[in-house]
Each structure stands twice: as C-alpha cells, then as structure tokens.
Amino acid sequence: MNNKIKVLFLDIDNTLLDFDAGAAWAMNLCFEKAGLKYRPEMFVVFKEENNKIWRRIELGELTMDDLFYVRWQTVLRHLGLTADGVEMEKEFRRLLHLSAVPVKEAKDILEYLHKKEYCLCAASNGPYNQQINRLKSADMLKYFTHCFVSEAVGADKPSRQFFDGCMKEFTGVLPSECMMIGDSLTADIEGGQAYGMSTCWFVHSGDKSAIQQNNGGKVADHIIYELAELKNIL
C-alpha cells in the first residue's frame, strides 16, 4: 500500500467500463431503429465528434444540456445522413444506460484496492443515474464509498469546482493524499494535477506511442497500459 495516498478517484468511461464497446453497440441499434444502415467504420466518426464535444464541455464552451441537442445532429451531419438527432440521442442514452462492459482487469483491481483499504471514489463526467446504473450492472458499485458524477456535482472535470465538490466530503484529507486515475489527459490528468493530486494516466488504447501526447511522460505522475499495473504503484 502507498501510505501517502488515502483516497483514489477513478474515472468510469474507458477506465473501468468500456465506453467504446457500449457506444458502438448502442449506435448500431439506434441506426437500426431509425432505418439507417450501420457500418463499423461509422463509429470512428462518432468517436471523433464525441471527443470534440466532450473537449468543449471540459473547456466550459458547452454544457451537458448542449450535448443532448448537438451530439447526434453533428455525427449525422458528418456522416451525410438525415434523421432526428434528438430522438437518436434519447435512444442512445437509454441503451447506454444498460451498457456495462468492464475494461479488462477492472473488477480485479477494484477488489485489490478495496482490500488494501483505500477509500475508492468514482469520478466521472456524465448523467448521474446512467453512470450509477452502469456501475451497479457491472457489480462495481459496491466498491465505492462515494460516486462523484458531474451532473450531480454541478461541475465537470477538469474544473476546480468539480474537485471542490469531491473534496468537501473529506475532512482532514489533503489533495496530495489523493490520486486521480483515468484515461483522459485533460479531464483526469490535467484536472487532478491542477488540484494538487497525484495522477495516473491509464492509456486505454494500450498504444505505447501515446506517451508522446504526455509531454514525454512529464504530465502524469504514473502511466499504465493495463489496470493490473496499479498493483506496482498502490
């Protein structure tokens, strides 16, 4: 156990639960319902546009309410398709609410960290009920003492307000005694680091060339390519 660290904040999407797998499944079914032909390469467009929108949310340029109206309108436009983007967003969220595909070794590492007596907290951007239901469906919710989701916190990662909302639940715990673990360099790593937390970047893609995005490894305190590597840190 790392005696310096007391509280672990773990991102959900593409850290504990495979958002990409769930989103591709949901997109396929959404297209089927809308009478559109889905091809796997279309998911690449969804990922690109979805990531751009979330980046703007993280920068404070868009809100979660904006996401509801613009995500599928934008994706459909880039695919050259016509459909009701708002209705597709509703169906996509309904399906995503049901999606709970664990990232490899996620449950094992949660069990390990729980036995090490760390205080485990989920820290995620997104709709509260959706994220809680997905953790519950994956049998992961039981490991967390707190679940901080942006919709309920009232602020998004990487804002200081989000981390303020988390830390107010802990009396006598310093940011330096906390670690933020996640796949996003902006929301998780930059957000945690700016708040004074230790950080661990999980490269969900497993692409070791991704370290080049991390300023030669100088942004995050730790970089891992598999969740099991946390055992070498904590």
Protein language model annotation of sequence segments:
Residues 1-8, 21, 83, 111-114, ...:
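Asp-based, Mg2+/Mn2+-dependent phosphohydrolase catalytic module
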Residues 2-104:
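N-terminal helical cap/lid subdomain that shapes the substrate entry/recognition surface
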Residues 36, 118, 197:
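Short glycine/serine/threonine/alanine-rich loop segments
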Residues 105-117:
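Catalytic-core regions built around general acid/base machinery
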